[in-house]
Amino acid sequence: MKPLAYRMRPTKIEDIIGQQHLVAEDKIIGRMVQAKHLSSMILYGPPGIGKTSIATAIAGSTSIAFRKLNAVINNKKDMEIVAQEAKMSGQVILILDEVHRLDKGKQDFLLPYLENGMIILIGATTANPYHAINPAIRSRTQIFELEPLTPELIKQALERALHDEHRGLGTYSVSIDDQAMEHFAHGCGGDVRSALNALELAVLSTKESADGEIHITLETAEECLQKKSFSHDKDGDAHYDVLSAFQKSIRGSDANAALHYLARLIEAGDLESIARRLLVIAYEDIGLASPQAGPRVLNAIQTAERVGFPEARIPLANAVIELCLSPKSNSAILAIDEALADIRAGKIGDVPKHLKDAHYKGAQELGRGIDYKYPHNYDNGWVEQQYLPDPLKNKQYYKPKQTGKFESALKQVYDKLMKRK
């Protein structure tokens, strides 16, 4: 017998749980099905939310024949068979799993069929199609993002399976404690496939009572779904979403949010990404407002790397809280980015002659190094002279902020020097 998650796959668009922003009657996919006019599309979202099942349900809601292939497993010959069927029948829906893994040869073969509409592609992927899918394919498809399933929607899927006598567990007399149901719904981490298969394991592995009832307790549920599933693909879209939220929470001084995202990265065992991002934050977002934050973060990272997980969470948490509650300044990154923008725009100019290297024979004959004023020979180690090239001689890249004691002190010095020019 096939697993419960497979048996409970929706066959019609009305059976789809969740994704109402796409499949409801008044939403885009719902309207396409009602109008009997499907366009090629890419469905993307996290693992276990039913992308391929939804694709099958969409195709099954039409009168058009459909075929399922996998971009990795199936070869070009398999696609040629689908194309031949499309030529004979006029149109075929191709459900293509892992569409982001489509190689160039298969892409080139599919493109003309997508162009003339003989093949309607419904691709499924966990990867962000804007990053992972060839632009030629993207331009011929609609891209729809599927939303993670909430615990309430997971419970809806479980209840449906418990009462379905044909495909589900409806032929069994099952009672399930509320706490057990909550564990399945929350413990699967949004993966309905995992929740359904855990429920089936619980039902099939639990002995009937004297009255023929199968009673599922929290203990049984925890045994069948032992660890809270946490989906975190280090190369996936969600990984960069978490890192982005992590940095933005620290930048926004929200220690609680930052600790939440840190915990997600820790749970994924992603020490390398945490370390890199914390160092970037220390210099990009804290910057000159508290320059000692950088070395302290580095020390925390080195400690974390030395002790490893689970203890690594302690120095990392210390560093995150300090960064959250430190004064913030991005004056340095703004300054260097403005300087780089000038360089890339061709605003360069020649190095002033008095600053050019004069440590070789004949340099003075070329006018190099002449009239250079050595600052250490002057009061307070400063003397007025031009350092920037002529086209930029009055340019000010650095614009100090006063969000920390250190940069406030730097600003006083900087302002004083600017006035003396």
Curated annotation (Swiss-Prot):
Disruption phenotype: Full RecA induction does not occur in response to DNA damaging agents; RecA 'threads' do not form in response to H(2)O(2) treatment. Increased sensitivity to DNA damaging agents H(2)O(2) and mitomycin C. Double dnaB temperature-sensitive-rarA deletion strains die at 42 degrees Celsius. Double dnaC temperature-sensitive-rarA deletion strains are very growth impaired at 42 degrees Celsius. Double dnaD temperature-sensitive-rarA deletion strains grow less well at 39 degrees Celsius. No changes in sensitivity to DNA damaging agents methyl methanesulfonate (MMS) or 4-nitroquinolone-1-oxide (4NQO). Keywords: ATP-binding, Cytoplasm, DNA-binding, Hydrolase, Nucleotide-binding. It is found in: Cytoplasm, Nucleoid. GO terms for biological process: DNA recombination; DNA synthesis involved in DNA repair; DNA-templated DNA replication. Its EC number is 3.6.4.-. It comes from the Bacteria. The keyword Transit peptide does not apply. One of its GO terms (molecular function) is ATP binding. Pfam families: AAA_assoc_2, MgsA_C, RuvB_N. ssDNA-dependent ATP hydrolysis is stimulated by single-stranded binding protein SsbA but not by SsbB; in the presence of SsbB, ssDNA secondary structure is removed and RarA's ATPase activity is decreased. The C-terminal 9 residues of SsbA are sufficient to stimulate ATPase activity. One of its GO terms (cellular component) is nucleoid. ATP binds at G45, P46, P47, G48, I49, G50, K51, T52. It is an enzyme of class 3 (hydrolase). The keyword Lipid biosynthesis does not apply. Homotetramer. Interacts with single-stranded binding protein SsbA. May interact with PriA. Belongs to the AAA ATPase family. RarA/MGS1/WRNIP1 subfamily. Plays a role in recombination-dependent DNA replication. Positively affects the formation of RecA threads during response to DNA damage, directly or indirectly counteracting the negative RecA modulators RecX and RecU. Stabilizes a RecA-ssDNA complex. In vitro, in the presence of SsbA, inhibits PriA-dependent DNA replication restart of both leading and lagging strands; elongation is insensitive to RarA. Plays a role in response to DNA damage, localizes to the replication fork but also to DNA elsewhere in the cell. Probably required for repair of single-stranded nicks generated by H(2)O(2). This is Replication-associated recombination protein A. The gene is rarA.
